[in-house]
């Protein structure tokens, strides 16, 4: 639940939080089918953010993407379970795709909600078998290639080169981007050129995966019974003898320099991946792709030059997440937000990290991102569709007006305030009107939020941008 102190410290995030809570509530659909009920319930447990993101998709794409996501999380659970010996894990990864059509197959492994996912995996299979043959084949092929790629890296104690690091991220995330693009095109909601530009979707996936690898350093290095080491020696070897050395506060300077090097490496995928945005046409698909990219860049901005990565968890506040989520509703809003985040990263580079050995290369990538965003914002397509800013939205203006009126009505009813102005209290009648106004204000606030959550611009999955 959102912490009250955080909300009070950031009042501008209150409305986005309420909107996000409303969307989360809507995402908890009641499905009579046991398989669908399990899949969407499990999706809520393993990734609340993706559960909301998936609701942006057109109806015909939600089930395939939901099932695809859970299948890959199950595959990832096998890879991440360090209690499984390699002689068991490797064959499981290489043959995982063969069990997609087996209604009886399940496995005991993982932790937390993933134990339930693996033990009740036949319910996922039930839904998978209802998908179109085309979607089934895309998912099966992607799972086969990913499982074999994961298996190739299991026998290695560490990732040695940046090229190996790129390959691993391609297997576990880049392939997903390409497969999802194929599902979008096969649905008829996107054009063939989205699949033709396979490297763009691959880079979007690699960017998000590298963001997770960077953020999860401490969790991975402390994994029992053996650490998971995805940072490539080619990078960290320049700053330490062992990857685990970065946990020692005495090595903070070297650790942060290595961290900045890793962030810089991830940014090169961000530059390339941006080129996929102009190809997306369906507004629901667009939002489902844009929101994770924004969250990824914000996470990198928080991690950059931040020693907290080696001490604990670095993540966005719930309110900030909600604010970013609700601010992305079309290409223009995406580029505006992305440019702002790139500007924040540039400021960190030129300020607190100005002496970093990699800062020139970091800035080169940041400037590339800024250039792409500015070019897109000045394009004829987006200028023609620029519309009003969020603060000019009638619903927002009404919301602010209600808030101001309610506040001053309340303040004026306070004895001290009335006394200063020589106004006599009207007793219970005024108290009653005050309560009525408060109730009406809250009701109108909820109506405004509900209306905004149903605006075609934000939720129409079938309209075209």
From Swiss-Prot:
InterPro entries to which the protein is assigned, alphabetical: Isoprenoid_synthase_dom_sf, Squ/phyt_synthse, Squal_synth-like, Trans_IPPS_euk-type, Trans_IPPS_HH
Signal peptide start and end residues: none
Domain of life from the UniProt record: Eukaryota
Membrane topology classification: Multi-pass membrane protein
Spans through the membrane: 395-415, 429-449
PANTHER family: FARNESYL-DIPHOSPHATE FARNESYLTRANSFERASE, SQUALENE SYNTHASE
Role, per record: Produces squalene when coexpressed with SSL-1 and bisfarnesyl ether and a very small amount of squalene when incubated alone in the presence of NADPH.
Family: Belongs to the phytoene/squalene synthase family.
Protein name per Swiss-Prot or TrEMBL: Botryococcus squalene synthase
């Amino acid at each position: 639940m959102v912490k009250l102190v955080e909300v009070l410290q950031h009042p501008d995030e209150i409305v986005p939080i309420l909107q996000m809570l409303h969307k989360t509530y809507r995402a908890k659909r009641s499905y009579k089918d046991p398989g669908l009920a399990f899949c969407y319930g499990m999706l809520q447990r393993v990734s609340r953010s993706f559960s909301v993101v998936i609701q942006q998709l057109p109806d015909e794409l939600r089930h395939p993407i939901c099932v695809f996501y859970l299948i890959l999380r199950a595959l990832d659970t096998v890879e991440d379970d360090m209690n499984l010996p390699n002689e068991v894990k490797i064959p499981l990864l290489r043959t995982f795709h063969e069990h997609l059509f087996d209604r009886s197959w399940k496995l005991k492994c993982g932790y937390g909600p993933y134990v339930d996912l693996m033990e009740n995996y036949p319910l996922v299979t039930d839904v998978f078998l209802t998908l179109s043959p085309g979607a089934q084949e895309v998912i099966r092929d992607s799972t086969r290639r990913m499982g074999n790629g994961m298996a190739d890296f299991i026998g290695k104690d560490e990732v040695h080169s940046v090229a190996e690091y790129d390959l691993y991220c391609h297997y576990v995330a880049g392939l997903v981007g390409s497969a999802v693009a194929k599902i979008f095109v096969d649905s008829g909601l996107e054009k063939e050129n989205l699949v033709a530009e396979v490297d763009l979707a691959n880079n979007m996936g690699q960017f998000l995966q590298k963001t997770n690898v960077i953020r999860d350093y401490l969790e991975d290095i402390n994994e029992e019974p053996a650490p998971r080491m995805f940072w490539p020696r080619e990078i960290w070897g320049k700053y330490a003898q062992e990857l685990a050395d970065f946990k020692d506060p005495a090595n903070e300077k070297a650790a942060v320099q290595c961290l900045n090097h890793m962030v810089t490496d991830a940014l090169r995928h961000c530059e390339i991946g941006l080129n996929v945005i102009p190809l997306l046409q369906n507004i629901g698909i667009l939002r489902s792709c844009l929101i994770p990219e924004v969250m990824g860049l914000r996470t990198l901005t928080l991690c950059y030059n931040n020693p907290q990565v080696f001490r604990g968890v670095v993540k966005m506040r719930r309110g900030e997440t909600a604010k970013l989520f609700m601010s992305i509703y079309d290409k223009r809003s995406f580029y505006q937000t992305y440019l702002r985040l790139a500007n924040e990263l540039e400021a960190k580079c030129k300020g607190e990290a100005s002496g970093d050995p990699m800062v020139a290369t970091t800035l080169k990538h940041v400037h590339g991102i800024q250039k792409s965003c500015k070019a897109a914002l000045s394009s004829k397509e987006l200028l023609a569709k620029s519309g009003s800013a969020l603060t000019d939205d009638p619903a927002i203006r009404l919301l602010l007006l209600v808030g101001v009126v309610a506040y001053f009505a309340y303040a004026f009813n306070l004895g001290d305030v009335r006394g200063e102005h020589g106004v006599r209290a009207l007793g219970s009648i005024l108290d009653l009107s005050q309560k009525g106004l408060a109730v009406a204000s809250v009701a109108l606030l909820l109506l405004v939020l509900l209306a905004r959550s149903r605006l075609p611009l934000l939720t129409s999955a079938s309209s075209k941008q």
